């Protein structure tokens, strides 16, 4: 292992240690139990010497006390090993479970604090793999790997002590062999760490590919994309297989190499034992104990070689998790907090570029939206309409200019307080795998009564279909409302915004998924909702925004026209052209 890799492993483990040491009581019990379990092998071997030496001249020479007590020693030793094995396994599994749970919670909570721009750049499948696969690798490093390291380490120390106690001359060969074995383990550890990192990335690709197919299953079927997805998944899964085989190959090579090195020690012991100088001093019991202990070292050495790969996988995964946790969370430097804003919005010379793009999405955009008024944004797709809505809620920060709410720049508000002032109904509705009632009252706790939820659903014209559901408002709707139609999902999103009763309302294609009849019904409810509120409407259907106090036409990130519906029609510009296209005038 290179010095940098060693330092990386050490630094990672130092950072992981507080998670483990928090449960030091369980860890201490487990370590003590592991040491007791490991020393059982040493105790078993130590009994060989008195048995052989005392019976060297025949069974009649065996001391009756020792022989009579042997069955009790063996039974007691087996019980002790069994009990210590159970205690160590249970305690370490408990500790590792707690550690992984806290890591997962920490990562999950950190993801919720990350800016939207982070998720624009990252694959959701890869991030899911970090929470699931990578954290499980950490569990291996803190449970089974730690079990092997402590138990086999104690076994090696115990067996070596037994060997030197009985014959330091025969055991001295270990002083030569041990550094060679240690060097070999360091070499394979470097290889294990590199492969483990590649396996994490490969698993992220597998998860991402599978997630894309599952979420886009209807599109795959509609366009006959089965072969495309099959080839994509075949490629990433084969890459995962290749990385796994590289790890297996490294393990398969490392084990016999370590055992061959250790076997030289056995050969040297046999040669030395055959020399006249030592032969006169050795008893059968001494030789059997030393040779048996040296042979017994094979198993823990092999186990330590195997566990090195497991430990390095855990450390590589842990390093990745900590790197994600170290990413800067969404900035929230605002101090201003208010119970309810009036809703007066001013946008002054705002320019904004998405982090993943090179060209600005908005260029020097300016407009005023007085409190209680309605402003509509229209234009072709990709012109920058929804971007303005994202900036009002500070999902992104502007490059230049000013974005003002009630006389204060939005960056001066506490993020949570700012977003409490705004209710958003987007064309991309997200619902949770929960009841209809809990989706409408999402994240509100006990702030709203059942009657409040029903009223919001009524205003959104959602009760018509809710009453037909098996359990009404208590019906589970599946992941992202999979059991509902597009229009039904949109109505629940509108009900959620109605219940929130925020002073600023953003309707981003809010009725795009509704049929004409439902749109008319909801439009009436939305018009009622808009009273005494500041409303920003983003729409393709011009019929929904004809009554707006002001309409802005956005094209390529710039406002090219502004005015009321009548003024823009009279102007006979871009808006009038859009109107003619939609209504066939």
UniProtKB/Swiss-Prot annotation:
CDD domains: ABC_6TM_MsbA_like, ABCC_MsbA. Residues 345-581 form the ABC transporter domain. Pfam families: ABC_membrane, ABC_tran. Residues 29-313 form the ABC transmembrane type-1 domain. It is found in: Cell inner membrane. SUPFAM superfamilies: ABC transporter transmembrane region, P-loop containing nucleoside triphosphate hydrolases. It comes from the Bacteria. This is ATP-dependent lipid A-core flippase.
